[in-house]
Regions:
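A short helix->loop->beta-strand "cap" motif at the edges of active sites that frequently abuts
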Residues: 270-275
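Oxyanion-hole/transition-state-stabilizing segment in secreted/luminal serine hydrolases
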Residues: 207, 224-260, 265, 280-287
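N-terminal secretory targeting modules
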Residues: 16-182, 351, 356-364
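Bacterial Sec-dependent N-terminal signal peptides
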Residues: 1-22
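Glycine- and acidic-residue-enriched helix-capping/strand-helix junction motifs
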Residues: 95-99, 193-201, 297-301
Length: 364
């Protein structure tokens, strides 16, 4: 009898949770059945991960952890609904900076008069067990008419399933790709989006909306040191150009060990494709920390030395400046990573040079 009572209690709990996490007035569509953008490798076996681990190997545990995250992935769809909801199932919710929308939330933009305008966001602040399948609104009380929507997925969490919901009387369908050309942007936690308040406030996101190019993000936390496994995968990427934030992680030793092999591996399969390296930004944690200042000075000097050689040695390789600071140098979120405004400044600082280089290759 006691076992029966326990079973019935558990059953009632499941039914209660199911009722809490569903809405009979909504119709849901799996996001992977819509238009998925922003991925260097679009056809990964798991749609909300950024690497095809079956196709490419040689990964370290830290690589896999970061590449399973959904940073930079966008869902494009159209709807005439006045309300839009999300219903995710997470494999993992990022445990650091738990109240940050970029790490654990969804960020929605809607095109208005030809411009992408922020529309709404929502976050999932509790553990996976409590948040999986929980329906939350992105935006409500919108005017009638079809909206072209762009939804950014969390930067540091891992997603197993994502459903987008609208009231049953309305439609939701695949959107047309609003971007032209595919540009791979691979880099450190700066490109991954650490420090951004929302997933749409990263450098790749800013650049995509500002230029109309599809900047496909492969930001990998503190793990971007031009390692061979990344080069071997990137050389197979179906993209029109590469932009690299390659000198923010690592040290002078990793720059020296990996730079030339990284370029040569990619160019072996992608001759004639532009490869644009961005100089790293000046991190504000150098201001009074002499050890950090010395480490960064040596790394930057080595990058400058070797890039001077690379520009002479290889065709289609470029080096451009980047900046994420205002005049007061007060745009950092934590001493290392920029704030939203800092990332916007960074995107603006590289936008013109990137566009100018791409025009040489008919990419415009």
């Amino acid at each position: 009898m006691k076992k029966v009572v326990v079973f019935l209690t558990l059953l009632l709990s499941v039914v209660s949770l199911s009722a809490q996490n569903s809405d009979p007035g909504l119709s849901f569509t799996e996001a992977s059945d819509l238009t998925i953008l922003g991925k260097v490798f679009p056809d990964t076996p798991k749609p909300y991960e950024r690497m095809d681990f079956e196709r490419f190997g040689g990964w370290e545990k830290s690589n896999v952890n970061l590449l399973e995250m959904s940073s930079g992935i966008m869902v494009c769809f159209k709807t005439d609904a006045p309300e839009i909801y999300v219903k995710p199932v997470f494999k993992e919710l990022w445990k650091y900076y738990p109240l940050n929308y970029s790490n654990r939330g969804f960020d929605l933009y809607i095109r208005k008069d030809g411009e992408w305008v922020w529309a709404g966001c929502t976050g999932y602040w509790k553990g996976v067990e409590k948040e999986n399948g929980r329906v939350k609104p992105l935006v409500k009380h919108m005017e009638s008419g079809v909206k072209e929507c762009l939804l950014y997925l969390p930067t540091y969490s891992k997603i197993s399933s994502l459903e987008i919901g609208v009231p049953q009387a309305y439609s939701l369908e695949e959107g047309d790709n609003p971007f032209r050309h595919r540009i791979c942007i691979h880099g450190s936690s700066f490109m991954h989006g650490t420090g951004a308040s929302r997933a749409g406030q990263t450098v790749p996101a800013f650049l995509s909306r500002a230029t109309g190019f599809e900047f496909c993000s492969l930001g990998v936390g503190g793990d971007c040191m031009m390692q061979p496994q990344y080069a071997n995968a990137l050389k197979e990427a179906d993209v029109d150009a590469f932009v690299f934030d390659a000198f923010s992680n690592g040290s002078d030793k990793t720059v020296e060990a990996n730079l030339f092999n990284f370029i040569e591996t990619i160019q072996s399969a992608k001759p004639g494709v532009p490869i644009i390296f961005m100089r790293t930004i000046r991190m504000e944690n150098r201001n009074f920390n002499t050890r950090r200042d010395d480490e960064d000075t040596r790394k930057i000097a080595k990058a400058e030395e070797l890039m001077a050689q690379a520009l002479k040695k290889y065709k289609d390789v470029y080096l451009i400046d980047s900046n994420a600071a205002d005049l007061n140098h007060d745009t950092t979120s934590d001493g290392t990573h920029p704030s939203d405004w800092g990332y916007h400044i960074w995107a603006e600082s590289v936008k013109g040079p990137i566009i100018k280089i791409l025009k040489k290759y008919g990419i415009k």
